[in-house]
Amino acid sequence: MALLSVSCREATPARAPETPKPELFLLTALPLVWSEDFGLDQPGSPALKALEQVYRVTAIDLPSQLPDGALLLAAQPRALPAEELVELDSWVRKGGRLLLLADPMLEWKSNIPLGDTRRPPMAFADTGLLERWGLRLDAPEERGARDGAVSERSVLTASPGALVATGDGCNVRDAGLTARCRLGKGEAIIIADADFLNVGSDKRGEQNLAVLASQLASLTR
């Protein structure tokens, strides 16, 4: 019996080591990682849960914290000081990969009073970054939900903006909802909406998160 037991243990195949997840850095003012009251007992958002299935997500406060060549999701970030905008531009041009959600009319509901710095910015604070990349972000003429598409994937947005090319570095797509920019050795995708991350667990939520996943994946190919 002892010999049989040893033989069975030796025949058990060794478990292959798990492949480590790639790292994704997250820069955002949206309540994706923490709820608005910063309660530790509050679960992460559906968007964060979806990201963590694929990536090791690391939240940062400033672009200067990024390592070279990394992947960054910047989702409606707070206004950055000028030196950090320069840092972000330089980081991309040195090989960084950026998915920027720049919403000119955020509809995400918040209980934080207007003027409180904890509240997500109602409009993307563009202080020249998009202009430097050859883009203009226009606010919508009318507010409300919009059915759209990103790279032929259905997406439900809320009061999305429109991107307009003002130079040669970016290719505007999806009826102005997105743009893809080659910048030096790096690349940036801009989506003129951030509300599409404010989802539940229904089919439309799954579709929106599939758009997020596909755009991030396209930056790693």
Where on the chain are the PLM-derived regions?
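Short, surface-exposed patches at the edges or C-terminal ends of soluble domains, predominantly
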Residues: 2-221
